[in-house]
Each structure stands twice: as C-alpha cells, then as structure tokens.
C-alpha cells in the first residue's frame, strides 16, 4: 500500500514539475516574441536636389541620362541602446526596389550616396563596383537591388577619397555627379515610407585654353588632369561637371574648394615658363576659366570674376611674356 501511494505521489510530482517547466518555457517564448517586435516592410523614396542653379550648371551642355547607382546604409538603434549599430547595406540601380523589413520597436538611421555616371563611368570589376562602393571589408559590391543584413559590414560613407573610374583609374574629382544625404531617428511605426533627401556635391568647370604663339602649353589641374596644346592646335574648349572629394561637406550651401592650376609653357627655343594660380570652384556653380598667353612683357595674371549671383562665373587668366 505504501509503495502504491509513493508511486502515485512520484507521478503527481512529475506532472507538476512538467507543467511548471512548460509554463516557464512558454513564458520565455512569449518574452522573446515581445522583444523581437512586429516587423514591417518600409519603402525608401529618394528626393534628389532641384535648385535654381541646376539650369546654369548644365545650360551649355546636353545632359544625357547617365546610369544611377544608389548605395544605402541602414543603422539600427534598439530601445535598450543609446547608439546606432550597423544593420544592412545594399547597392541598387532601380529605386523602385529599395525596401527593407524593419522592427517597429527600434529606430533607424539611413545614409544614401547616389552616383550618376557622366563623362566618367565607375569601374566595374568582375567582383562588382569599386570606390566609392568598396565595403568596410575592402570588397567590391555588385548591384543586387536588395539589402544585405550585416552588423559588421557596410559602405564607408560619406566618401572622402578617390573614385575608381573606367580603366581602374583613381581620381580625386571624377567627371560624374555625386549626391549624398542622411536621415536620423526614423520610427517604422509612424510611416510606411522613408523620405530621404540628398544634395549634390558637385561643381562645374568650363576650361578654355588659347594655343600659344609658339611652342607647347601644358595645363595641369584638379590633381589628375592635364591638357597639352601646341601652337598649331585649335583653341581647347571643354566643359564638365565634377564631384568634390569631401562629399559630406560639399553638400552644404556655399561650399567651395581651392584648386591649383599649373601652367607650363615650353617655347620653341626650349625656354620653359611656369605659372601656378589657385582658383576657387564653388558648389553648383559652372566656373568659366579662360587661359591666354600673349605679348608683351612683363608677365602678369589678370582675373575677372563675375559679380552677379553665384551660378555662373568667368575667370580670365592671361600670361604675358
């Protein structure tokens, strides 16, 4: 009889412990679900910059529809955290496909770089696009039109170094258009669409170089470019839109950069004359620089800057011998 009672008590206790264990497990699952929160698909709408200076910047040049690439970083901040951490990144060429699933219990920060190819194209290797779309793991990125979730890898935005263009050539100021923007503290509970504003980080340069009366004239500018004009050549006339190197700073209104233009004139008798002049090139402004070498001596440099609104500027650089 005692044995039977002991057996019944053992069974009852086992059932009780099993129920308690089940309750504890279910409670843990419930908390985990609550911690994960509700997931929501969010679309991104990129608002590109349109300003009154756009027409003057591109007025004298037919602007073709260059290929656009959209590089996007997404950062997440959980309720228990005070700072953002890497969440996802992706490279797109179709803006209609830019969407991502987010947790409604978290806040998000977005970062976007648009590169619109122009006279220069980005270098595309077998493994993907190079700078400015090399990841923090030093790898090229392919266009997948989708996000890759990662807590350790993304794009090292904002870019502030060289850009790799066709031919695997690295330049500081490529002849293409970069736009950049960020958005902080987006709450997925408040909207189904992220509206992210980007601004251009570009300047225009219209360079005119008259051929020298004799010999050869070389003009080096923007660290990577050199034009060579002989006495028998026609006037050099070229206009392009370039991107600044310091992208984050260059999207600010009124931003400008100072660049050295180096002139080297080799005369027929082998005599070499050099001149260096720094010019200020302004964001969203097409600057016209005209370089002329003429007589008589002494050497001088004449600079004439337009005093009207900063949309189009003329600068004459005359070197007299």
Language-model segment annotations:
Residues 45-65, 208-215:
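Structural motif
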Residues 66-126, 215-285, 311, 315-321:
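Tryptophan-paired
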Residues 4, 16-52, 284, 311-321:
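Bacterial Sec-dependent N-terminal signal peptides
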